[in-house]
Amino acid sequence: PVGSVLVGSQEFINKAHRWRKMFGGGWRQAGVLAAAALYTLDHHIDRLEEDHVRARRVAEAINAMDNFSVDLDAVQSNLVYVNCNIPAADVVTSLAEHGIDMFDLPYNRVRVAIHLHITDEDVERIIAAFAAQ
């Protein structure tokens, strides 16, 4: 929905700010997103790795399935983009029947987002639901 948070040295942030301005980027009410990012950095930074490990588990399992592929090199956060060899809209419908909410993306893809409330058991349910395709 809104992307990510950029973290770095003051020099790096100044350079990024300049590039953002040159390309016309900007969000006037960024404070709400910034507050959420700061809260995460202050309270959840240590557990973000858990999301990344779970995302990697999902990506590797789905990539091994016949109907799907994942660019494993691109899985470096909590997001997994799945290329579907069957209609992504059908995948979304089937996942919903397993209690997993998702939406299809352009180019016959779906995105799996692992977050604070996704457990190891949920990861196994996600994998099983994809395997049922």
Label for each model-derived stretch:
Residues 1-84:
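Active-site C-terminal subdomain of aminotransferase-like
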Residues 56, 63-132:
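Conserved C-terminal alpha-helix-loop-beta "cap" of PLP-dependent enzymes
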